[in-house]
Amino acid sequence: EVRDDVPPGAGKFRGGSGVVKSQRYLTPGFMTHESDRHLDPPWGIFGGKEGAGGKMEIHNIHSGKTRSEYSKFSGMRAEVGDVVSYYSPSGGGYGEPLDRDPAKVLDDVLDGFFGPAHAESDYGVVLKPVDDGYDWALDEEATKILRTKMRA
């Protein structure tokens, strides 16, 4: 599934969303895992912001306990009911976020890549709720004013 716990890196061209892959152990076993960018998130370039780092979590559905693990390990014991979830990093942005077309930022919010607060803080795009708060519309005048302030 698409990773929705963190936004992708902001930029004129935003970074890609990470993904979440999970598997549940039905019997005891051992696992090996290798990934990168847990401590050093993907960089943004030419004014783009960095993406989010990856992470690895193991949640046991019987005990209710969740623990985080390092990005690389081998021969780790897995118990019955362990759900191993790998969150891949999200990509860094390319170019200045304030140069992204506000209509594209609105599309990103409507498509669930990030929320209106992120649109405002990172892209300088002000959205207003419509249809009882279940939809959003671009506030062009407020966006123009905010972006001017953010560029100063």
Description of each model-found segment:
Residues 51-89:
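Generic long, charged, amphipathic alpha-helical segments
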Residues 1-62:
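Long, charge-dense accessory insertions within large macromolecular proteins
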Residues 3, 89-94:
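Short, charged beta-turn/beta-strand-edge "cap" motif at the junction between a beta-strand
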Residues 98-152:
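Intrinsic disorder at enzyme termini
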Residues 14-16, 49, 77, 87, ...:
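Active-site-proximal structural scaffolding
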Residues 42-47, 96-97, 127-128:
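A short, polar/proline- and glycine-enriched secondary-structure boundary/capping micro-motif
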Residues 32-35, 66-70, 93-98, 116-118:
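Extended hydrophobic-aromatic, low-complexity segments
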